[in-house]
Amino acid sequence: MAAAMGTATGPDRNDALEELKIYGRDPKNADPIFTANVRRSTASVSNSLYLTIVIKGITMLLRYAFHTTSSETARAALRVIANAMLLKPETRQMFVSKGYPARACEKLKTDNWDDEFLFSRILFLSTYGTDIDLKALIEDCQLAEHIVNNLERHINLPSDKQKQKLDPMEEMALGETLKLMFNVTHFCKAKMSAFTPAVSHIVSLLWKQDSSDAKPLEPPFSPLVNSLLNLDLQADQSQLSLYPENDPNKVTSRILHLLDRGIRAYSENDLETVVTPVVSLLSKLYENAPREVRQRMKESLLPTGEDRQAVLGRGDSLPSVLLKNSTNPTAPALRDAISHLLFDLSDKDASKFVENVGYGFASGFLFQNNVPVPASLSSSLSTGDASGNQRPVNPITGQFLDEQKFANAPEMTEEEKEREAERLFVLFERLKKTGVINIQNPVEKAVQEGRFEELSDDYVEELD
């Protein structure tokens, strides 16, 4: 390496590393990069330094990244390493085994967006499939402190409206820092409290810029939401940031706004991964919120009197859209998160849950979670309308009874009634065999009680 460094100028080194980064995007053409220390290479390259780097493998790259005085050379090497760690998981353990996580933690103390992005990304990738000691990095290398300080730097920048030109690396660096914090708090829960000071910074960053109409949860909003999920929201320091005394509903209103826009903007393929964390965060916020905030969340997320003008889940309000997705077959995690949130908003009371969303939406959740269906559930419930008047509600659909509309279908003929009775008989028998519920076929019950009379084929009903 010394000979190569002596014979190559800084620009030559950087050009070689840039070329290596391009080769490194395809593992098929760059196996030597992904080894710890390669002796020879068949790579056909003209640059002698490029050949030296390939021969030495990732060991040489780590030296360039961490033991050079040129920041430009170090960043070029870090980009190659980051690509290698992304494409070849075995290189992550090489990075850890050689003791570089501690050095990377030290490098997080920076005021350069490129450095923050690269070191955060490499540490983030090293949390997968390695024996990295995150606890030691937090205790001995100030990992949590550096992450929190970097988040604070993003707050101190001018807002969108004040910036003349946005630096794309600033946003990318923020995203990698948030992803790193999420993984560290996920894999090292014992040291979660070290990141509590980050809550106030994350809250501030929620207002750093406006979300887009097409993708309201694109970075930084999705990473900001995700990062809060693993933090201690019960801590006094967190409570002051999440429910400020002068406006306790401020944060939850922001998250509700993101949910309202996000659940409408994304296709079914993206709902599961993008929107589910927002719903999960609202559950955590509700769990730790003061009474005033809880009440506001209930008013925003539970069906209103206006929603009950029709069968619940058929309108365009946020509660209606949530109910629709609570039975979404293509997004199982989202539908479970929504049902749990609505159950929490119902004070985890099965009777209130049925009253709020209707038995049609509540039954599946109650059954899956072994929550007994309330025995006192009456055939009709009542709830307040927009003016506060109590009106009877269909317990299955959640709609006001006086708003129900029935189709003007002609009365069934005797033959149609017989076919329908036979169909119901078969369905009851199938249901009984499943063992899911203990039910008796009404025809069988009628026979046992002597209320069933078999008529002859020539029977004619006499009319008065």
Feature-to-residue mapping (PLM):
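Extended HEAT/HEAT-like alpha-solenoid repeat tracts in very large eukaryotic scaffold/adaptor proteins
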Residues: 12-19, 77-80, 118-122, 166-184, ...
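Acidic, Ser/Thr- and Gly/Pro-rich intrinsically disordered linkers and low-complexity segments
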Residues: 1-3, 149-172, 206-217, 256-273, ...
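Eukaryotic scaffolding regions of large macromolecular assemblies
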Residues: 233-404
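Residue-level signature of the C-terminal ends
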Residues: 23-27, 45, 84-88, 98, ...
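Elongated alpha-helical scaffolds that mediate protein-protein interactions in large eukaryotic proteins
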Residues: 1-118, 125-149, 163-170, 186-197, ...
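Amphipathic alpha-helical segments within extended alpha-helical solenoids and repeat-rich scaffolds
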Residues: 32, 39-46, 50-54, 58-65, ...
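Intrinsic disorder
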Residues: 7-10, 68-71, 113, 168-171, ...
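Intrinsically disordered, low-complexity regulatory regions
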Residues: 1-4, 8, 14-20, 348-350, ...
